[in-house]
């Protein structure tokens, strides 16, 4: 039995430096084994392994493709880590953007908020937060990945009817700009790269949670 970290392909592409920082920290401080892309790494899990994820899509794949393996978000691993070099955000007011792909994962959502509190963030909540969120940036305006039918057909096919509706790039930008009008803070934090790209497409000053916490790592 071991604990295995899935670093998230899209997050690693977004920030190879910060992805490497957190992987090295998990090895050094927690003895967590590393793997690569969930599409191939899931088959390396053995009975009793615990899978740690940063990506909400990885989470869905783990839960459906290897349901006998326990899964936890990286935020649940780190939230009580007193050795972690938490940044001090100086009481900044930051809005939390929850992701549809994790709408039913309250432990993840709560851990994100507890970490923000540890970093001295004044959290601002959206009306459509927690289980009410239907947001995942512009990713829901594109064709579904063929991986969905293999690894998470219930969540992303059966239970996502009418959710993925491809639209032209210019319309994606307009929809993201409209979404961004609701924010009352200068900065928005999210924990999904799809959400991040969508928010930034709409002109929002958005930051990924991992980028925020690794500032002093």
Kindly label every feature range from the protein language model.
Residues 1-217:
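Iron-sulfur cluster-binding electron-transfer modules in prokaryotic oxidoreductases
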């Amino acid at each position: 039995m071991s604990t295995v970290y899935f670093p998230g392909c899209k997050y690693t592409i977004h920030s190879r430096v910060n992805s490497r920082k957190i992987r090295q920290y998990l090895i050094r401080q927690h003895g967590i084994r590393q793997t690569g892309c969930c599409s191939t790494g899931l088959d390396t899990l053995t009975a009793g392994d615990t899978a740690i994820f940063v990506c909400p899509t990885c989470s869905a794949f783990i839960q459906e493709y290897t349901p006998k393996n326990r899964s936890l978000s990286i935020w649940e691993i780190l939230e009580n880590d007193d050795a972690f070099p938490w940044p001090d955000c100086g009481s900044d007011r930051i809005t939390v953007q929850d992701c549809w792909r994790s709408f039913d994962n309250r432990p993840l959502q709560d851990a994100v908020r507890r970490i923000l509190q540890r970093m001295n963030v004044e959290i601002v909540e959206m009306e459509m937060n927690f289980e009410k969120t239907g947001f995942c940036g512009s990713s829901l305006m594109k064709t579904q990945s063929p991986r969905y039918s293999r690894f998470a057909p219930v969540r992303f096919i059966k239970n996502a009817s009418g959710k993925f509706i491809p639209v032209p790039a210019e319309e994606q930008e307009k929809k993201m700009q409209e979404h961004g009008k609701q924010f009352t803070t200068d900065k928005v934090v999210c924990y999904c790269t799809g959400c991040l790209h969508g928010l930034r497409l709409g002109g929002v000053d958005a930051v990924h949670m991992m980028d925020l916490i690794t500032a002093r790592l």
